Amino acid sequence: MIPMRKIKLLSPRLANQIAAGEVVERPSSVIKELLENSLDAGATRLDIEIEDGGIKLMRVRDNGGGIDKDDLPLALSRHATSKIYELDDLEAVATLGFRGEALASISSVARLALVSSTSEDSAGWQVVAEGRDMETQISPAPHPRGTTVEVRDLFFNTPARRKFLRSEKTEYTHLEDVVKRLALSRFDVAFNLRHNGRAIYAWRAGDSQLEQERRVAQVCGPAFMENAVFIEMERGSLRLWGWVAQPTFSRSQADLQHFYVNGRAIRDKLVSHAVRQAYQDVLYHGRHPAFVLYLELDPSTVDVNVHPTKHEVRFRDNRTVHDFIYSSLHHALAKVRPEDTLARKAADLGEDTPGIAPYAVSPRPLVEGIAAGEFKGQGAMSFAPSTSGGYRPGYTSVSPGTIREQMHTYGELLASAEPVTARALPQTPTEDIPPLGYALAQLKGIYILAENAQGLIVVDMHAAHERITYERMKAAYAHGGLQTQPLLVPESIAVSEKEADCAEQFADIFKTLGFELQRAGPETLLIRQLPVILNRAQAEQLVRDVLSDLIEHGTSERIQHHINEILATMACHGSVRANRKLTIPEMNALLRDMEATERSGQCNHGRPTWFLQSLDELDKLFMRGQ
């Protein structure tokens, strides 16, 4: 039994060391507090020097407003701050720090020296604390306007805490992550980082979008920016802007996710759910999206004082914020088209972007052997003299929709087609070439090879057609249900009694999905109607898979919540299969539909549907021009 002990008031030192357990976990915690103080002081330049991963030394110098001599003793006192004076200030706090605990907690577990000046004549003052009972002495110390805080020998007086520190490399990695997060929060501030005497980063300040993108590329890597889409959405007092990576740039870990609320880096469950929901339709299972996003809203509508390290926040209207983030990202991802990706690719290669003609309306045959140079609905090939000498082919413009209707393309994929021999592209102005170019050939019955203005396009035809079918089915379902087509001869399938019961229980849902099923026995179903868009699918297996999904999700409410998963299952059955030989017109029609379809860069499972191998990249493979 624990003996009864008297209640005693803790000493200032012990109280601060206990508080340090929440505030100071490792060197990265110290750097976070010091940098936030500098940013709150109005600094436009931060110089950070680290030794031994921050365990031996952390020094931060800024050019902010500095601290008055008379305020220096208070700077290291607990619950002393210049950022809030009363409760009303806390409800709309705009600074990163406000509790007045950081320096007191740090100085209780490390050797801390603070030098500051508020004047331009380099007349500064220094205060030192080394884990003592808050006894500090002030002495003159030359220093330009601003503040330098030096922290040495972290946890030197608390061995139990020190033994929990990891290796120098691990601690430095955590520290570097903190610097990166803060560098992304303030593009208008220059950051310079040195470790063990070696310059690591030197990020210049800049406010233009080009300078911001340069900072993001430096912090997150150029590959992120190559695959990122800039978004900016506003609704009332809410504004969301930043960069989101395309789903094909997903990550195995959630290590490239930066979200800021009024400039404060946070990790919030509500935000994470909204982002995850926006990506769920295009992200491969087990993968994580990458993004750098900034949410701006009225400070009085968000509470930042709910977590010791201020990583979590609480919104006054959770549902409004969640739906705004979700709808903004969902809309942005849906609007990404192949020409957007190709334009960024060209920019990264230092090229102009000719040929990026969204929804080009002048498709043309690429090969000889199609009815004397033409196919249904398209004018015969003619040759017009070019201004550069020689000849170039000319074509009659026809809309993609007309071509699709008149040549009965891949919607009738099982129809017979005459073989077509592909040959080289005629030389035509690049502005006539649509984003995904024109088909050249089919590889192994799986991939479509096409040429566009920049190089070679490779398309996974099943994945691409699956996405197109899926998006059409979602649109039809949202407008009242899928159109149905009766079977000339109803098809009978044997099912379990549970599956037959499910078909009867959810008959209305099946009808909305375009099916008509009739129970013909305890374990028998008749398929009388199928969705028109899936008229070439294998009816029996399609119905079995939909039944399986409905049984898995159970109630009608859950089924409606997971309806996209069911539609994705159906779309997979209705899409062109591997080893199906397509004609050149069919391939071109598929490319045009990809250009006009939302989220066509990924299949329903999040895998990419196409990629570009630029001419420069091909030249490098063959070492041309080297």
From Swiss-Prot:
UniProtKB keywords: DNA damage, DNA repair
Single GO MF descriptor: ATP binding
Biological process according to GO: mismatch repair
Gene Ontology, cellular component aspect: mismatch repair complex
CDD domains: HATPase_MutL-MLH-PMS-like, MutL_Trans_MutL
Record bears the keyword Oxidoreductase: no
Known role: This protein is involved in the repair of mismatches in DNA. It is required for dam-dependent methyl-directed DNA mismatch repair. May act as a 'molecular matchmaker', a protein that promotes the formation of a stable complex between two or more DNA-binding proteins in an ATP-dependent manner without itself being part of a final effector complex.
HAMAP family in the cross-refs: DNA_mis_repair
Cited NCBIfam families: mutl, PRK00095.1-2
Similarity comment text for this entry: Belongs to the DNA mismatch repair MutL/HexB family.
Protein's name according to its UniProt entry: DNA mismatch repair protein MutL
Lineage: Bacteria, Pseudomonadati, Pseudomonadota, Gammaproteobacteria, Cellvibrionales
Gene coding for it: mutL
